[in-house]
Amino acid sequence: MKKITYYLILISSLSSQSISSLNYNGFGLDIGERGSGLFFNRTWSNSEKLCFISEIRIFDVKHPDEIIIQDYYTGRGYKFNDINLLLLPLFSGAKYYPFVGKIANNFAPFVSVKAGPILSLDGAESGTFKEKWITNLDYYFTLGGYFGIGADVLTSNQTILSIRVGYDILPMKGQIDGSDQYNGALVRFGCNWKK
């Protein structure tokens, strides 16, 4: 319980007024080899070539053999090999822009590296919502990371659109839902705006 309290304090400090001097806020969509999710980030510049990032992600892990079958008589879909596992990475890292001043227009390629703690929420595989996510919920803490490349496209209204391709490093403490890691390739689409 102390770890969850520490984790929540860390998350709330990221969104507090004490760091209101950050240059960019943003959100986006993750589509990965092992699942999909959303991310929320804050970015601030150290120089034209280097930015620092903090982000929290909500990542819904999928079983590699998960399938959805449609019942044509009722129109209802059924999932098989479904797992209930949410990962909440809280990563900090940097974006490096190697081509500053070398590429014209509003296109800015970058390299990104992030690392930090991961809270894994493992719900039961069957039952009601309460039985899956409240009564039978297990949680674990580990450390993980991300590295990748991408590009920012700056628009005229102070919005930055980003696309990134990278690799998640998401280890687990032992076997959780059949695997001890959920590493995999990841494509990220993001939208940032100046604060």
Q: What feature does the model see in each segment?
A:
Residues 3-14:
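Sec-dependent N-terminal signal peptides
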Residues 16-59, 190-195:
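Short glycine/proline- and aromatic-enriched beta-strand/turn motifs that initiate or cap beta-hairpins
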Residues 21-23, 34-38, 84-90, 107, ...:
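Residues that define the transmembrane beta-barrel architecture of outer-membrane proteins
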Residues 24-28, 75-82, 131-137, 172-179:
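Extracellular loop and loop/strand-boundary signature of outer-membrane beta-barrel proteins
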Residues 25-29, 40, 52-56, 92, ...:
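Membrane-embedded beta-strand positions of outer-membrane beta-barrel proteins
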Residues 31-35, 56-62, 98, 115-123, ...:
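Transmembrane beta-strands of outer-membrane beta-barrel pores
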Residues 44-129:
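Gram-negative (and chloroplast) outer-membrane scaffold detector with strong preference
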Residues 91, 95, 182-195:
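Outer-membrane beta-barrel "beta-signal"
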